[in-house]
Amino acid sequence: MTQMTSSDVPGMGRRQFMNLLTFGSVTGVALGSLYPVVKYFIPPRASGSGGGTSAKDELGNSVTASGWLANHSDGDRSLVQGLKGDPTYLIVEGDDAIGSYGINAICTHLGCVVPWNSGVNKFVCPCHGSQYNSTGKVVRGPAPLSLALANIAVENDNVFVSQWTETDFRTGEKPWWT
């Protein structure tokens, strides 16, 4: 086996070296300037130990259980910003508890936000009249499916929303939204 001597190895020319240096510099600057742009489009996430997203009120502040329960009574269903920024209903159960599930407020027919109508104890879609019972199960179309569910957890007085992957307790079937 023979070794190559330095005279046998072709050297890098000045032009090739400058091209390589220029390419490396431009690539480094481009990647460095791209980082804040990508970071801008990824929303900040406050998460609990269960991997959920912090529920936000209409002003974008994190929801605390004590503050929520002080302003909402038993049976109340009010909107917070949940998973992916979707409007999600928090349910107050009793005088001192937030329900273990939330209801996504997006109608399964055409995507309208469905308001809670406490007078008839239903969610009634203003767009085409779909109706859902107090748990979000569709009771009158044209909506084809029940409203999606989300897990709600309270940790250290902070309210977290996470993806519902269990069986849908309203239908006994696998959730359609997972």
Swiss-Prot record:
What is its subcellular localisation?
Cellular thylakoid membrane
Q: How does it assemble?
A: The 4 large subunits of the cytochrome b6-f complex are cytochrome b6, subunit IV (17 kDa polypeptide, PetD), cytochrome f and the Rieske protein, while the 4 small subunits are PetG, PetL, PetM and PetN. The complex functions as a dimer.
Q: Which reaction does it catalyse?
A: 2 oxidized [plastocyanin] + a plastoquinol + 2 H(+)(in) = 2 reduced [plastocyanin] + a plastoquinone + 4 H(+)(out)
Q: Where is the Rieske domain?
A: 68-161
Q: Which GO terms describe its molecular function?
A: 2 iron, 2 sulfur cluster binding; electron transporter, transferring electrons within cytochrome b6/f complex of photosystem II activity; metal ion binding; monooxygenase activity; oxidoreductase activity, acting on paired donors, with incorporation or reduction of molecular oxygen; plastoquinol--plastocyanin reductase activity
Database matches in PANTHER family: CYTOCHROME B-C1 COMPLEX SUBUNIT RIESKE, MITOCHONDRIAL
Instruction: Work out whether the entry's keyword set contains RNA-binding.
Output: no
Q: Which InterPro entries match?
A: Cyt_b6_f_Rieske, Rieske_2Fe-2S, Rieske_2Fe-2S_sf, Rieske_Fe-S_prot, Rieske_Fe-S_prot_C
The GO annotation for biological process reads: photosynthesis
Q: What is the enzyme's class at the highest EC level? A: translocase
Free-text comment on the cofactor: Binds 1 [2Fe-2S] cluster per subunit.
Task: Name its species.
Answer: Prochlorococcus marinus (strain MIT 9313)
**Does Translocase appear among the keywords?**
yes
Other noteworthy facts: The Rieske iron-sulfur protein is a high potential 2Fe-2S protein.
Q: What is its EC number?
A: 7.1.1.6
> Where, by residue number, does [2Fe-2S] cluster bind?
C107, H109, C125, H128
Query: What are the GO cellular component annotations?
Result: plasma membrane-derived thylakoid membrane
Annotated TM spans:
20-42
Q: Using the UniProt record, give the first listed, main subcellular location.
A: membrane
The disulfides recorded in the entry are: C112-C127
Membrane topology is: Single-pass membrane protein
Q: Which residues form a coiled coil?
A: none
Which cofactor(s) are needed, names only? [2Fe-2S] cluster
Q: Which family does it belong to?
A: Belongs to the Rieske iron-sulfur protein family.
What is the protein name stated in its UniProt record?
A: Cytochrome b6-f complex iron-sulfur subunit
